[in-house]
């Protein structure tokens, strides 16, 4: 079922690009206004959710059926750890907050990106999106590479420069959610003049293919796991 709505987050990111790009104010003002709105709820829920998990599991823990939750691991000591380690990353209790961490990163780069977007030509944008589109295929290349005999570098299975001492490969700076911001800006600046029939004719097959690929990759074991 999750594969059906996997496109939701990219669509939310695209709406962010539609509404905010190009940034029309200074970096400091933009950061204060946008990131300032995210930090309070991030702080609140990073503290509230572990407390709620702890209270629930110590009240109804015996009835918990989730195979990923061990009520015995929710000790007072672990609760305290969860309450301060959110500064490094989200934890199991706060998994839905991953989106806010990602959104802060996008807000940080948007003023810089906006300066380029103002002077970029249509061809510039198309070239960026083409390279970004290629970068989106990297997870599938990583799945296929071991089938072709690729054994990694010193045990690290990263591609094109990724290794134990470097997490930033060739396509790192063209990868991730930043491309959805540029795609949204491009579609606003150069809108497609398609009929509804053509739009559905193109998008429905793409959605079906995306669903099948996502579903199959999540339910099938990775070639790495079979070696």
Show where each model-derived region lies.
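Hydrophobic alpha-helical segments with transmembrane-like composition
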Residues: 12, 21-22, 53-58, 77-148, ...
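Transmembrane alpha-helical segments and their boundary/interface "anchor" motifs
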Residues: 2, 6-11, 23-95, 104-106, ...
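Aromatic-anchored segments of alpha-helical transmembrane domains
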Residues: 46, 131-142, 205-216
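Membrane-interfacial loop-to-transmembrane alpha-helix junctions, especially the N-terminal start
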Residues: 30-34, 123-128, 196-203
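Membrane-interfacial helical/loop segments at transmembrane boundaries in membrane proteins
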Residues: 68-69, 153-159
């Amino acid at each position: 079922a999750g594969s059906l709505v996997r496109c939701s987050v990219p669509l939310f990111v695209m709406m962010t690009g539609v509404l905010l790009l190009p940034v029309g104010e200074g970096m400091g003002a933009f950061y204060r206004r946008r990131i300032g709105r995210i930090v309070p709820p991030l702080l609140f829920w990073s503290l509230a959710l572990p407390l709620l998990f702890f209270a629930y599991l110590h009240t109804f823990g015996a009835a918990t059926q989730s195979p990923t939750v061990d009520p015995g691991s929710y000790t007072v000591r672990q609760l305290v750890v969860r309450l301060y380690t959110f500064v490094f990353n989200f934890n199991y209790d706060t998994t839905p907050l991953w989106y806010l961490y990602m959104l802060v990163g996008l807000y940080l780069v948007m003023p810089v990106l906006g300066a380029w977007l103002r002077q970029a030509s249509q061809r510039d944008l198309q070239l960026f999106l083409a390279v970004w589109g290629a970068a989106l295929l990297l997870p599938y290349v990583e799945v296929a590479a071991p089938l072709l005999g690729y054994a990694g570098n010193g045990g690290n299975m990263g591609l094109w420069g990724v290794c134990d001492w470097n997490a930033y490969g060739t396509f790192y700076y063209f990868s991730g959610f930043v491309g959805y911001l540029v795609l949204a800006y491009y579609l606003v600046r150069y809108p497609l003049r398609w009929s509804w029939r053509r739009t559905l004719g193109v998008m429905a097959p793409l959605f079906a293919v995306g669903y099948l690929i996502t579903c199959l990759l999540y339910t099938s074991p990775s070639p790495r796991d079979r070696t």
